[in-house]
Amino acid sequence: VDAGFGGLRDDRFTRRLRVADYLDLTDGDTTGFFRDDCDHGTRVTRNIGGFSNDTLLGLACKADYYLVKSDLEHGEPREDERRLCRALAWLAQRQVDVVNISLGYTVFDDFDGYTPQMLDGRTALCSRFLDSLLDAHPRMVVVQSAGNEGKNKWRHISFPGDVAEAVTVGAADSEGTGRSGKSGTGYYPHPVKPDLVVYDSPNGTSFSTPVVTGLCAALMGYRPMKRRELIRLLHASGTRSAAPDLETGYGIPQCDTLLGFLDTPAELQTLPLNATQ
């Protein structure tokens, strides 16, 4: 779900991806979907599964892609939040396994009713909707960007990144030991948010998030599992799994650790249950 997929069918890293279906919720245009002036979604998709003959940018290069434009590139009307809900419903109807949302909401041009104190997963419209959708679809995984408010007045993650079973992804600093300055932080101690961080390239949590989306798709392809089990694995593999915090969550997920868990079923039974609390 994004703000535009301009150039996706011409970009050397995304032109060979399998697009199963697509939808424009902003104006209903389908003929010009891939000629959009905005290419934010295309750049995000590169990090999910982009590849060329000699380069692999994302891990989900063999997935089927369902693309939805729900957000306006310029301005922040509250209708963007409503369209996100409709986009998620459309994807759920198509039984999409893993959803990437490199969008997030805090304040709007025409609505100022949200505050950081409302980051409880139960208050914002899109958070309530996503929470109920995930409850109805235990195998659906939604990977949500933490947002780039870390240096702004808001400071914290954006909605719907506060939903307990959304995999909320922030951005790590260049050393991989802390939070990139503008990456949003968690507000409440439980559940820990963001869940994970990844180095962002290009800059911003919009581009760290799809790295984790590609990882989730690859893991689900390797061994299908329910969402809670996947989240528990991701948390347990993180570089800060022993001491998660509101800056970097459970840290950077480690692929070698994840594969070790998957290849040794006994280890799965000993992972801490509080990893998803």
Where are these regions (language model features)?
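Short pre-catalytic strand/loop immediately N-terminal to key active-site residues, enriched for Gly-Thr
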Residues: G28-D36, Y199-F207
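Alpha-helical segment proximal to the catalytic Tyr-Lys
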Residues: V169
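Substrate-binding/access-modulating region of protease and related hydrolase catalytic domains
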Residues: F51, S70-F159, S201-P210, E247
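Catalytic-loop motifs flanking and including active-site residues across diverse enzymes
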Residues: H40-V44, F207-V212
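Short, small-residue alpha-helix embedded
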Residues: S208-R223
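C-terminal subdomain of the subtilisin-like protease fold in secreted/lumenal serine endopeptidases
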Residues: N100, G221-Q277
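Carbohydrate-associated surface elements
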Residues: A172
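Subtilisin-like serine protease catalytic core
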Residues: V1-L23, D29-D80, R94-D97, D110, ...
